[in-house]
């Protein structure tokens, strides 16, 4: 097994209808430093996932392929099967399995596949986390930029800005501030130029 995986406990769900095979497989996975949760059927898989938060799922039940609904399971899933014909392989992929192994399988190959799928899953999570961080950073930079531009407004311009956000017209602002409507229009023009906006609607959502 990969050195990094050996350092940690990998949590695995095993769907195995036959009790003695489940025991043998769980013993094998235990030797590989895996924590194995065994279920005899697919029915309660969602509950098991929510309870144990596993890293990967292995299903040894090729007799009931059509019963598996995998579209809502965002975990790597491996099928152990005796079905090796082309049509069977196509069906396996269409159902959403990430990988499959023909029985009897090579234990080392199975561990290699598990290791590879787990790393892919983690890399995807890391990429999603990075994208989320970048998105948040862009929002912060945008807010800082808008805040900096707002700071450059004069006292009078900030007053007009606030009144526009409150929904007042130019005429209403001129009455409140005791200045001409023409003066208000000049302030509005300056605000548009400094904040690089084009209309009053953009002022209403400026800090959002």
Curated annotation (Swiss-Prot):
Cleavable signal peptide: none
Protein name in the entry: Probable transcriptional regulator ycf29
Residues with PTM 4-aspartylphosphate: 60
Pfam families noted in UniProt: GerE
Domain Response regulatory per the UniProt entry, residue ranges: 11-118
InterPro entries: CheY-like_superfamily (IPR011006), RcsB_transcriptional_reg (IPR051015), Sig_transdc_resp-reg_receiver (IPR001789), Tscrpt_reg_LuxR_C (IPR000792), WH-like_DNA-bd_sf (IPR036388)
Residues in HTH luxR-type domain copies: 146-208
Compartments, as annotated in UniProt: Plastid, Chloroplast
Gene Ontology molecular functions: DNA binding
Highest taxon, organism lineage: Eukaryota
Keywords in alphabetical order: Chloroplast, DNA-binding, Phosphoprotein, Plastid, Transcription, Transcription regulation, Two-component regulatory system
One CC-aspect GO term: chloroplast
GO biological-process terms attached to the record: phosphorelay signal transduction system; regulation of DNA-templated transcription
SMART domains according to UniProt: HTH_LUXR, REC
């Amino acid at each position: 097994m990969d050195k990094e995986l050996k350092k940690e406990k990998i949590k695995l769900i095993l769907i195995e209808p036959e009790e003695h095979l489940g025991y043998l497989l769980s013993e094998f996975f235990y030797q590989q430093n895996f924590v194995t949760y065994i279920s005899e059927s697919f029915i309660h898989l969602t509950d098991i996932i929510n309870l144990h938060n596993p890293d990967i799922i292995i299903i040894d039940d090729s007799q009931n392929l059509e019963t598996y609904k995998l579209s809502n399971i965002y975990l790597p899933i491996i099928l152990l099967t005796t079905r090796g014909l082309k049509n069977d392989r196509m069906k396996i992929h269409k159902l959403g399995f990430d990988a499959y192994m023909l029985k009897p399988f090579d234990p080392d190959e199975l561990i290699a596949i598990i290791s590879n799928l787990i790393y892919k899953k983690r890399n995807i999570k890391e990429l999603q986390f990075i994208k989320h961080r970048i998105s948040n950073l862009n929002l912060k930079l945008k807010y800082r930029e808008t805040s900096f531009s707002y700071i450059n407004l004069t006292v009078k311009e900030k007053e007009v800005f606030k009144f526009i956000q409150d929904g007042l017209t130019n005429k209403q602002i001129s009455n409140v501030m005791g200045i001409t409507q023409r003066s208000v229009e000049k302030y509005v023009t300056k605000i548009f130029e400094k904040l690089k906006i084009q209309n009053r609607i953009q002022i209403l959502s400026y800090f959002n």
